[in-house]
């Protein structure tokens, strides 16, 4: 009887399908449960990864890069992570592990976690939760604390008219009708001569320029330094007073100091290293170097020529007063980075025993593109040099073939084929640290150029690496 029932059941095709279906339901239910729980765990992991990303990035923001206490950094990262990691479907809120590694100015933050995603089919999978884990790494180089040494050329060549219109007006108003000193007539330079009577004049070209509201290149340099230290209206951070330097200090959470110098025959100290605000109070003291009269540099009997630009000498003097730079971090015992900002037309004009980049113009007068030997010495100490080249161009005089014959003989050869590619420009580029060179031609915006160059030196970036 039983044998017959079994045989009949085995022969029944409908029964076979039922059995096969029943047998297949077991792995199907298992796979379906596993897929649902695995998908849920992946979603939880993505959310926790985002929380780890946020925590890592928050720990390398500029405000946090000034923090030197690892515990504070770790607690900050943990708090940001916890705010985003309190998710339903986890056995507990995970507590992240935060590691902080500082290497010089670079900080690396790693936020890692482990968690358990609750399974909806624990009996099917044989486990109440699915383990998940992840990590995120953020790495940023903090902007360094810096000392800036602003070195401005105030030699007679900086008395050139600021624009072509200024040059034309200066030439017009230094004609014999207005200027009785023959050596200063028809000149695009507003030289400051304290004894113009020696040459038969009653007022020097600087006085004429001021009375005619003619803007000079030295005026643009002064305005650019004023924007750097005293007044800038474009700071993206509200509540910051002062110039570009104070704005960048606030944005980067750094400490900047500034020193202010001019140079001609030698180095002139306007403000020793101090706060940007204190240095800014001395900007009004930037002025052209005075000469006694044409072909004389002082009021003694030792007049040699109207030379007055010793760039290498000024760099040598400033180098002797600068300390060895540090990394610029906030680590105890570290010191700021040191940066020289040189603003010049790049042509030396001095009495010297040797003239390596040119031939003597006479009376040991060396008029040459900058000898970059001192630049190499400075950079080898780890000091950075930023250079703003205010290009030395030939003066174009209306209806006069050549009024600047001296320039054509002793300067123009070093400006060929163009002022941007000649030896003067090349030597200044060589003097500057990589990427820290900018140039401005007559009529160019010196304030914008100096501001952009400063921002380039002071800027840093942060990036996320996962």
Name every feature range the model reports, one short phrase each:
Residues 2-26:
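Glycine-centered recognition micro-motifs in short, flexible terminal segments and loops
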Residues 2-8, 34-466:
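P/S/T/G-enriched low-complexity
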Residues 11, 29, 342:
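Short glycine- and Lys/Arg-enriched binding-loop motifs that mark or flank ligand-binding interfaces
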Residues 19-36, 50:
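Alpha-helical hydrophobic helix detector
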């Amino acid at each position: 009887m039983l044998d017959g029932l079994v045989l009949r059941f085995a022969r029944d095709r409908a029964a076979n399908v039922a059995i096969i279906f029943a047998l297949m339901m077991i792995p199907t239910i298992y796979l379906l449960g596993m897929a649902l729980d695995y998908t849920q765990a992946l979603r939880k992991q993505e959310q926790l990864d985002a929380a780890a990303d946020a925590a890592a990035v928050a720990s390398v923001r500029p405000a946090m890069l000034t923090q030197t206490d690892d515990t504070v950094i770790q607690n900050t990262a943990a708090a940001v992570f916890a705010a985003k990691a309190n998710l339903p479907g986890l056995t507990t809120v995970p507590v992240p592990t935060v590691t902080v590694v500082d290497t010089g100015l670079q900080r690396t933050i790693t936020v890692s976690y482990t968690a358990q995603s609750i399974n909806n089919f624990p009996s099917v999978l044989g486990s109440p939760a699915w383990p998940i884990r992840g990590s995120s790494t953020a790495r940023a180089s903090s902007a360094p604390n810096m000392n800036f040494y602003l070195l401005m050329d105030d030699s007679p060549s900086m008395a050139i008219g600021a624009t072509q219109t200024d040059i034309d007006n200066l030439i017009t108003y230094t004609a014999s009708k207005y200027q009785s000193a023959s050596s200063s007539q028809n000149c695009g330079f507003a030289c400051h001569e304290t004894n113009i009577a020696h040459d038969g004049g009653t007022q020097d070209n600087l006085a004429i320029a001021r009375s005619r509201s003619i803007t000079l290149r030295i005026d643009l340099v002064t305005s650019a330094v004023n924007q750097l230290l005293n007044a800038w209206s474009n700071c993206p951070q509200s509540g910051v007073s002062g110039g570009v330097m104070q704005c960048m200090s606030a944005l980067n959470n750094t400490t900047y100091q500034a020193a202010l110098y001019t140079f001609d025959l030698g180095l002139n100290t306007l403000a020793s290293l101090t706060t940007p605000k204190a240095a800014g109070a001395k900007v009004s003291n930037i002025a052209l170097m005075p000469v006694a009269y044409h072909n004389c540099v002082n009021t003694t009997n030792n007049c040699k020529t109207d030379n007055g630009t010793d760039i290498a000498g000024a760099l040598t003097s400033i180098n002797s007063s600068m300390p060895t730079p540090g990394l610029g971090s906030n680590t105890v015992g570290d010191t700021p980075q040191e940066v020289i900002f040189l603003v010049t037309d790049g042509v030396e004009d001095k009495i010297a025993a040797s003239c390596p980049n040119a031939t003597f113009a006479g009376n040991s007068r060396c008029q040459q593109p900058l000898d970059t030997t001192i630049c190499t010495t400075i950079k080898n100490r780890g000091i950075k040099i930023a250079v703003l080249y205010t290009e030395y161009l030939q003066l174009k005089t209306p209806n006069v073939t050549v009024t600047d014959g001296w320039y054509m003989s002793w300067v123009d050869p070093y400006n060929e084929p163009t002022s941007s590619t000649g030896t003067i420009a090349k030597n200044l580029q060589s003097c500057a640290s990589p990427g820290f060179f900018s140039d401005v031609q007559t009529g160019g915006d010196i304030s914008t150029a100096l501001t952009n160059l400063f921002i380039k030196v002071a800027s840093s970036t942060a990036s996320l690496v996962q």
